[in-house]
Amino acid sequence: MLKIRIKTGDQVQVITGKDKGKRGIVIKVLANLSKVIVKGINLAQKHVKANKNGVSGGIISKELPIHISNVAYVDSSSNLITKITYTKLDGKRKVRISKRSGEIL
């Protein structure tokens, strides 16, 4: 299992696969599967059956999970992809730091 350094709300870029180069915001992190769901990325058409409660059926687009190794964090200051590292501030609190810019995330 990979160490998950990307959190919900982070902007990421797809670095491999059919959506390579596209950017989006992380909606959900599936830590047990080492996958993330990114808004507008890895869309699939799903057929939905009509419901008795009045929900109409049809075809909807849905985001599918992407493996964590196929996305990279986008540094907000430089707008480039970067790696993330952890360090302790004052020996107490663990914070995420961008390796490219050195800023606290």
UniProtKB/Swiss-Prot annotation:
HAMAP family assigned to the protein according to its UniProt record, in alphabetical order: Ribosomal_uL24_B
Disulfide topology: none
Organism: Orientia tsutsugamushi (strain Ikeda)
Keywords: Ribonucleoprotein, Ribosomal protein, RNA-binding, rRNA-binding
Name of the molecule in the record: Large ribosomal subunit protein uL24
One Pfam entry name: KOW
Purpose: One of two assembly initiator proteins, it binds directly to the 5'-end of the 23S rRNA, where it nucleates assembly of the 50S subunit. One of the proteins that surrounds the polypeptide exit tunnel on the outside of the subunit.
Family to which this protein belongs: Belongs to the universal ribosomal protein uL24 family.
One GO term of the biological process aspect: translation
Record GO terms (molecular function): rRNA binding; structural constituent of ribosome
SUPFAM superfamilies the record matches: Translation proteins SH3-like domain
Oligomer and partners: Part of the 50S ribosomal subunit.
Cellular-component GO terms for this entry: ribonucleoprotein complex; ribosome
